[in-house]
Amino acid sequence: MSHAIKTALIWAGIYMAIEIGIVLVGYSHDPRVHVIAFGVNSLCLLLAVAVSIVTNFNKKKHEGVSLVVDLKTGITTSAIYALTIACFLLVYYKWIDPEYPEIRKQQWIEMTETNKFQDGVDQTIKNNPEIYYGKSSEDIRDNEQAGINMLLNSNKVFLISLLALLVLGMFYSFLVTAFNRLVLAKLG
């Protein structure tokens, strides 16, 4: 098994352990914790890509590693990480915590019915009258709630997380490769 794949699986395992830890501690339905978990997921992906690219570069720098090899290593790592995490999220939302989508839906619906949300919608309509011509704040709230139903389907969560992590992983691959070539390679 290549180093890129091992690195991806190790960092995906770290993220999954953190998610399971959140469930075991009892914070799995707190929306603020999911924002933090999203940040941890992004950080684990970044660290997986960085460790993979830098380690591969340092291991093979005497052979003259090309830029394409660095990018390929990073993208391979991010693809394995993304697929692993997307599958984990599918399993999580279908079998580990199947009531979470309904709980999250209720939290979002309650949020859309607050005065703060109403004031934000009214301000948005006022600032962009041509975009929201003929629409009321109730129409916008109903659209938000319809979008919530669509996004909380476990199959859609799988697809969205897979695509988002793949795109983010490619971006991280370019970023880490550039940083490695421009800064780290000059230092070492």
Which residues does each predicted region cover?
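Alpha-helical transmembrane segments of multi-pass membrane proteins
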Residues: K6-I10, I14, K72-Y81, I160
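Juxtamembrane interface at the cytosolic side of transmembrane helices
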Residues: N58, L168-G188
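Juxtamembrane loop-helix boundary motifs flanking transmembrane segments in multi-pass membrane proteins
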Residues: M1, K59-L67, N143, G147-S154
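Functional transmembrane-helix hotspots
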Residues: F88-N128
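Transmembrane alpha-helical insertion/packing segments
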Residues: M1-G64
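Alpha-helical transmembrane segments of multipass membrane proteins
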Residues: I14-I22, C44, A48, Y81-L89, ...
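Individual transmembrane alpha-helix segments
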Residues: Y133-V167
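Hydrophobic secretory-pathway targeting helix
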Residues: F57, L67-Y93
